[in-house]
Amino acid sequence: MRLLLTCFVVALLCATTIFAAPYAAIVINADTGEVLHEENADTRLHPAGLTKLMTLYVAFDAIESGLVELDETIRISKKAELEPPAKLGLRSGQRIKLRYLLRAAAVKGANDASTAIAEGIDGSEAAFARRMNGYAQELGLTRSSWKNAHGLTEKGHLTTARDIANLFAAHQRDFPDYFNLFSRITTNAGLRDVVNSARRLLVNLRGTEGAKYGYTRAAGFNTAAVVRHRDMGIVVVVFGARSTATLNKQVAMLSDKAFSELITR
């Protein structure tokens, strides 16, 4: 019996190790890009929902450049309808304004909305992914490769904690008028109101100006957050946490450590 129990415990520990997502983290100065903390920051990992930061960056630039309009109506495809959760609940043939799709993707992390954004801008998700990769190169996100607009696990769809930190900083720098989307606890997404998947972090960590969550089994729980204290701003990125509670604690700890360092300079 003792041998069987020992074998079971060993097997359980091995299973936990096999399915544990790799950990990575980075903290950068939001204004200067200076690295304040890093751990496995250049390891290429599954981004999960943080993919939507790239999707939204491309979409915001498409609006600003006149390629599409914020109130343009997007027709929903069967592909978008069939995306797995999290989702808004879009139906094939339905028409909805782009602004609502952006809200659903940014706040709820809706996969169906993300695919609809991609198809609305470029006609297909594959074409939009090529655009995402082009923007990534322009932004210096050299270790990222994007295959889809939502972040569901796909071979070769990878990024790093460093690239995500620089991308989120670019959001606040390049599209300040849209950055409030990442701070909304709830928002009207056209079909219904949706709740922010990062709401606990936004509510409980003072100074959080914006946050984006992601989760898949391959990625674990991950987040990117912009936090400000006094006149100092940082971007905190964590990959591979075991739970949202662990993720939030890690962000809070890294934020405290970074601000303590900045204050004493």
Named regions from a protein language model:
Residues 1-5:
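Positively charged n-region of N-terminal signal peptides that target proteins for export
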